[in-house]
Amino acid sequence: MRKKVIRCSLNPKSIEKAMREIEEYKREIIRKTELLRQRVAERISETASQGFGSAVVDDLLRGGARSASVDVSIDTRGNVSVVIAKGEDAVWIEFGAGVYHNGSAGSSPHPKGGELGMTIGGYGKGYGKRNVWGFYEDGELVLTHGTPAAMPMYNAMKTVCAEVVDIAREVFK
């Protein structure tokens, strides 16, 4: 969007015309700002979806790795858009589970993990403090090394923060 120059003379018609131009310019800025918000949210959603799609949710001792089941969506209310990762695997993929892949118990490979209380071995009964633990699924004992922290939401934010100037230039051109 180019710099807008509005000229007017000191007479009622010219001032009214200038005021209409200002209102039109204001509407255009609001429209483009909404478009920027939408484009940024879409880019975060797209990038996070790719991260969740390629993540391992369980590193099983038998049967290999299991893929995640996470849906990423955008919720827009008024002038706020929120990117949401929904699914029982989302938190494990974002923050990791178990010391085998993620470092010592009580730490977090995720830059926000400690701040948010998402530390390794800190959830539930603390089985993630072990290299291997099990859970029952369909009556069968399943042994796992846990989940490597893939951080798809965090990484999507970092990626889009690096791209936001280019996105804004494209929207406001």
Which functions belong to the PLM regions below?
Residues E94:
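His/Glu-rich zincin catalytic helix
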Residues M1-A90, N102-K173:
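Short, Lys/Arg-rich flexible segments
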